[in-house]
UniProtKB/Swiss-Prot annotation:
This protein is located at the 30S-50S ribosomal subunit interface and may play a role in the structure and function of the aminoacyl-tRNA binding site. SUPFAM superfamilies: Translation proteins SH3-like domain. GO terms for cellular component: cytosolic large ribosomal subunit. One of its GO terms (molecular function) is structural constituent of ribosome. This is Large ribosomal subunit protein bL19. Belongs to the bacterial ribosomal protein bL19 family. The gene is rplS. It comes from Pelobacter propionicus (strain DSM 2379 / NBRC 103807 / OttBd1).
Length: 119
């Protein structure tokens, strides 16, 4: 491991939720307004994940007042407080850009069935 990789590894967050594309997540974002700081929740569907390592980012899409809003978050950014998984989605694509064209019930994502393993 060279020096740059070592420095990047030190700055990466260790407790990142293992979410995937298609999952509905709630992202807690730090917002600084003047000298005040607050946390804002942003909930939506993960439509893509890009890159890897410290440069990794993900795009979350939600519908706000009938208008689709997408926001890109760097995964290891200090402005991200937490990423909480609300529901798991079952999709067959790595990028869900086709959701931009769909409206209403057509834009729904199947929920992944969770079956606990019996011992």
């Amino acid at each position: 491991m060279n020096t740059i990789d070592f420095l990047e590894f030190e700055q990466m967050k260790k407790n990142v939720a293992p979410f995937k594309v298609g999952d509905t997540v709630k992202v807690q974002v730090k917002i600084v307004e003047g000298d005040k700081q607050r946390i804002q929740a942003y909930q939506g569907v993960v439509i893509s994940r890009q890159n890897g390592g410290i440069r990794e980012s993900f795009t979350v899409r939600k519908i706000s007042n009938g208008i689709g809003v997408e926001r890109i978050f760097p995964l290891h950014s200090p402005i991200l407080e937490t990423v909480e998984i609300v529901t798991r989605g079952h999709v067959r694509r790595a990028k869900l850009y086709y959701l931009r064209k769909l409206r209403g019930k057509a834009a729904r994502i199947r929920e992944k069935k969770y079956v606990p393993i019996a011992k």
